[in-house]
């Protein structure tokens, strides 16, 4: 199985049909962000989308929007629930850091940098948001 051969970290890889590429893409976790889960009780990673073409595997993030949208809808719901139950504080932000990073990077992967910025402003409630954003983008830019 192709999806099992791509290192996916804590995310179980899965295949899904994408209208954006009119075919199957394989969704895996982006293991570069695993360290953000060290203080979490629920683990999550941003995702990468891969396309299999003519015997080769290609990163298809720039071509796939719908998968990132679906992933982020789940993240948005989870964050809203956490902030509703635990309060909109920096302390809550620290507990859901991996969710925030995943949503932000998923928006970047889908080409929605402006939406990513708005997302970060809404959900990252600590004073060091620029530092956090810079650290995420440094990791993100190492592959892309």
Describe the residue ranges of each PLM region.
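Repeated scaffold domains used in trafficking and secretory/extracellular systems
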Residues: 8-18
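Generic structural motif recognizing short loop/turn segments at the entrances and edges of beta-strands
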Residues: 12, 21-25, 46
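A short beta-strand motif characteristic of beta-propeller blades
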Residues: 2-7
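Acidic/hydrophobic-patterned starts of short beta strands in beta-sheet-rich repeat architectures
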Residues: 18-34
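Acidic, small-residue rich beta-repeat scaffolds with periodic aromatic anchors
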Residues: 29-144
